[in-house]
Amino acid sequence: MVSLLKKLIGSRNDRLLKQYRKLVTQINALESKTAALSDQELAAKTQEFRTRHAEGSSLDDLLPEAFAVVREAGKRVFGMRHFDVQMLGGIALHNGKIAEMRTGEGKTLMATLPVYLNAIAGRGVHVVTVNDYLARRDAEWMGRLYRFLGMSTGVVVPQQPNDEKIAAYAADITYGTNNEFGFDYLRDNMEYRVEDRRQRALAYAIVDEVDSILIDEARTPLIISGQAEDHTELYVRMNAVPPLLTRMASEPKPHEPEPEGDYWVDEKSQQVFLSERGHENAERILSQQGILPEGESLYDPRHIALMHHLMVALRANTLFFRDQQYVVQDGEVVIVDEFTGRLMVGRRWSDGLHQAVEAKEGVKIQHENQTLASITFQNYFRMYDKLSGMTGTADTEAYEFQEIYNLETVIIPTNKPMIRKDQNDQVFKTAQEKYNAILNDIRDCHERGQPVLVGTTSIENSELLSGLLKQAKLPHEVLNAKQHAREAEIVAEAGKPGHITIATNMAGRGTDIVLGGSVDKQVDLIRADESLSEAEKEARIEKVRADWKPANEQVKAAGGLRIIGTERHESRRIDNQLRGRAGRQGDPGSSRFYLSLEDPLMRIFAGDRVRGIMERLKLPEGEPIEAGMVTRSIETAQRKVEGRNFDIRKQLLEYDDVANDQRKVLYAQRNEVLEASSIRPSVEALCEGAATDLVRQHIPADSVEEQWDVPALEQALAADWQIHLSLSDMLEKESSLTDDDILERVLEAVRGVYTGKIALVGEEAWAQFERSIMLQAIDTHWREHLSALDYLRQGIHLRGYAQKNPKQEYKREAFELFSGMLDRIRDDVVRVLLTVRVQSAEQVEQAAEAEASQPHVQNVQYHHSDYDEALAGTDADAQPAQQPVRNFMPKVGRNDPCPCGSGKKYKHCHGKLA
C-alpha cells in the first residue's frame, strides 16, 4: 500500500525536488539577462541585494536573482557553470537541509550559492570543513568568486594570532574546521575582555562532509584542559600488572561455571572486566609492588583511583594497538582517526587512557589534564540559527540527522547517470585466502591498465598489503596517516593507467580521482617552476593536456577506476564513501569487497552464520562465497552496529544536554559580567544574599532568642569576612532587637565595608577588580563542577540496580551540584571583596593591567594560567590557592560526616560520587 502511494504521489524527496525545480526554472530564465551585465554591474548586485533585504525583502525572495548572479560569476571567474542539479543542492542547503550529492558532482562549487545568498544578511556564514588543508584551499579557491562579487572571506586555523581570528570572523564568509569553530566558542567563554572574543552570534553554517563531523565525531567532546595532578610513576608501575594477569578464553555466561582467567574483553563495547579471581590476583600483585597497602581492598574509597588506573592499563594493553588506533611518532603517541585514517595531532584520549598507552609504549608520559571547558559537536552546532550540510553519503544516517539535529536529508540526482558496477562481496575462510584473491584482482587490473584504489581499515593492514605487493613486484603508492603530507599528490595521480593506490579508510576525501590522472596538479607544478619562461610553461601545459586525453580514454576502456575493499567497516556509510570514489560524473568504474571470517566485523557480528553456510556448502580451500544473501547478512550486522552506535550517541546527548543547559546559564551570566558597564548592582545583591544566608544559619527567621547562636554568628563574620561586630553587646543594650533587626545590622556592616573599599581605591579601579574576581570565581568553580559531573556520570548507571532511573537521578543530582556551585561562586566573590586589603589606587591599576596582559590559551590542550592577585598587598588568607582536583580521599565511614564540610553524611554526599 505504501509503495503504491509513493508511485501515485511520489516520495517526500521527489516532492521536495519538484518544488526546487520550479525555482531552478526561474533562475534559468534570468541567465541571459544576468549574462548581459558588465563585471561592475554584476558586482554591484551584492549591494543592491543588501539594500533590498534591509528594506524588507526576505532571502527567499532574493534567491532566484542571487543564484543567477553566482552562476554568472562562476562562469567569469572559474570558467565553470553551475549545473541545474547544483542549483537543486544549493536550494536544499539554503532551506536548512542536508544535500546528498555523489562524489565528483561539485559540492564545493554548489555551496557558493547558499553561502552568497545568506551572507547578504550580513550576519556571517561559517563553512565547516574536515581539515585545515580543505579550509585553506576552499577559502582561497572560492574566495576569488566572493571577492569578485564584493564579499570578504576569512579562514580560521590553529595557532592563528587572535587579531587575525577576529578579522576572519568579522568577514562575510568564514572557512574553518569543526574543531577550530568549537574551540573558538569555548575560548570566547574563557576571555577576560570583550574585545578579545572572536566569534559573532552563530547565524548560519554549512557543514562539508556533514556525516563525518556530526555523526562520526559526535561521541568525541571538544575539551580545553589544563594540567592536573602528576601520576606519571603510577602509570609506569601499573603497566607492569596486565602481563601478570591471564585473559579468559571467553566471556562468562550466566548459570555456567566461570572460565579460567582473571579478565575478559568485550570487543563490542570496548571494555575490560575483571573476574572474582582477577580482583584477588590484582590486589595481591599491587600489594607485592607496594602500590596497595597489604590487606586493603581496591574498592575502598581511598583506593578507588587505583582501580581506575588498573582498568585503563588493561584497556591500553588489550584494546589499543600500535598502527591501528595510534602511531608512535617523534616519541609521542598520536591518535589515528578511525574513520579517515588521518593523524589527529593534539588530540588525546581522556580519563588517563592516553597516559596508559604512553606507559605501554615506553615514551614520555604527558601530564594528566583537568577539564577547563568542554562541549560536544552535537550541542555546538545546534546553537546555530540555521544549519545545513552536504556529503556524498547521508542517506544511511538520515534518521539520526532528523532525530538529533532536526535536519532533513535531500538526495540530489547526479548530473549524468551512474554506471559504476558494485559487485557482491566475496567471503573467504582465512585472511591468507582473502589476500591471495586481492593480489590476483590487483595484478589483473594492473596488466590491463586499469587503476586500482584499495581501501584498508588500519595502517597495519595497509602496510601488510604493501609488503605483499612488493613481493609480487607490483608498483604502488600507500596513503595512510604516516604519508599524510603527500595525500593530495597521491590521490591526484591515483587515476593514471595501471596505477595502484592503497588508502586507509577514506583518507583523501576532498580531492577527486580523475581518470587518466589530474591535469590540474601537473599544471600547478609547471606554473610554480621559476626556471621556465612563460612560453615554455605554456608549451608544457599544452603537452600535458594532450597526453591526458589518450590516458583518459585508455582507463575508460579498461573499465574505469577499480575499488577494492579489504574489510567491511562498522558503518555502511564508510564503505559507500570508498565505493563513491569510482563512477564520478558518469565515468565507468567497479567495486568489490573481499572479506574473511577472521575480519573483526565478521568475527564479532556475522562469523558464525556465514561459517555455517560455508561448512554446509563444503567449499574447498581458497573458494569464496559470493551471493546476495551473504552480502545482505553482512549489511544486517552493520545495521546492528550502526543502531548500537546511534543509541550510544543519543544517550551521550541526553546526558550532555544536562551539562549543556547548565553551560548556557553559566556562560550567559559570565557574558553579562563581561559586557556590563558596571556589575556593582549584581555584586551588592550577592553580598546581601550571602549575608542573609549566614545570619539565617545562626538566627532562623521568626525564631525566639533561645534558638539564636549569636557567638557563632560573630565568629563566622570575623573568620569569613573579617567583620568584627559585637552583636552580644547590642543585644544587652537593646533587648527588644528582633531577628530582622540583627539581619539589618549585619547588612549595614557589610555595605559599610564594601563601600569603604570603593572609596579607598576609586570607582573605576574597583570595578575592574571586582569584574576580574567574579570571572575568576566563575571559571574556577565551573572547571571543578565539570570534574564533579564527570565523576557523577561514571557511576550513575549503578542506580539502575536500585530500581531508579539513572537519567532522572543524574538530572536531579547534577542540578544539586550546579546550585551548590552557584552558591560557592557567590561565597568566594563576597569573601574576596570584603577581605581584600588595598593600599592605593595606583597599585590596583597596575595589577589590573598585569592581569589583562596574561597569556591566553592558544592550543587544543590549554593551561588556563592562574591569574595574579589583582590588587597589591592582598592578604594571603583572602584567596587560598586553587587546589588541583584529586582522586584520593581520606578514609571515611559511610555514616561519618562528609569531609567536604557540607554537614551531610558521607554516603549522602561525596560518597555517592565514589
From Swiss-Prot:
It comes from the Bacteria. GO terms for biological process: intracellular protein transmembrane transport; protein import; protein targeting; protein transport by the Sec complex. May bind 1 zinc ion per subunit. Signal peptide: none annotated. It is a peripheral membrane protein. Its cofactor is Zn(2+). Its main location: membrane. GO terms for cellular component: cell envelope Sec protein transport complex; cytosol; plasma membrane. It holds the Pfam family SecA_DEAD. Its EC number is 7.4.2.8. ATP binds at Q86, G104, E105, G106, K107, T108, D512. It is found in: Cell inner membrane; Cytoplasm. The keyword Transcription does not apply. Zn(2+) binds at C898, C900, C909, H910. SUPFAM superfamilies: Helical scaffold and wing domains of SecA (SSF81886), P-loop containing nucleoside triphosphate hydrolases (SSF52540), Pre-protein crosslinking domain of SecA (SSF81767). Part of the Sec protein translocase complex. Interacts with the SecYEG preprotein conducting channel. Has a central role in coupling the hydrolysis of ATP to the transfer of proteins into and across the cell membrane, serving both as a receptor for the preprotein-SecB complex and as an ATP-driven molecular motor driving the stepwise translocation of polypeptide chains across the membrane. NCBIfam families: PRK12904.1, secA. Belongs to the SecA family. Monomer and homodimer. Part of the essential Sec protein translocation apparatus which comprises SecA, SecYEG and auxiliary proteins SecDF-YajC and YidC. This is Protein translocase subunit SecA. It comes from Bordetella petrii (strain ATCC BAA-461 / DSM 12804 / CCUG 43448).
